[in-house]
Amino acid sequence: MNNKNLYQDEWEKSPGYVYFIGAGDPVKAVKIGVTRQKGMMQRLRHHQSSNHEPLRILAVIPFESTERPMRKAEKKEKELRTKFAHLQRFENGWVGSEWFTVSDVLLAEIDKIGIKPKERGIRDSIMIPGPGLDRQGGR
């Protein structure tokens, strides 16, 4: 097995999450993504460092009790992105296409199928608002 196949095999066998990250307060957009469970906070840090809006994890869907949890997580992520394609903020396949405009239907689906981060022992945010950020996202 070559290195690429070894990495793919390790990735697929890792416990994972489909995650929903909300941008803004109140939430204006939702990112639907997938990551290994051990990398969830690193993903949030990565996204927050390149986003001027406060980000927080709205919910996660854990995948861990199958032979290849990440493969199942990726399949679920694709299903959700397809289901909410009409809310996609950027053209499919381009940078940013994992971001969706918030809607009552999307938030209801997240509440229905997701688990709150606190229930998994995950912090929902890594930022502390500064003096230049009010509740409407600006001054």
Language model regions located:
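Non-catalytic accessory segments flanking enzymatic or RNA/DNA-binding domains
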Residues: M1-R139
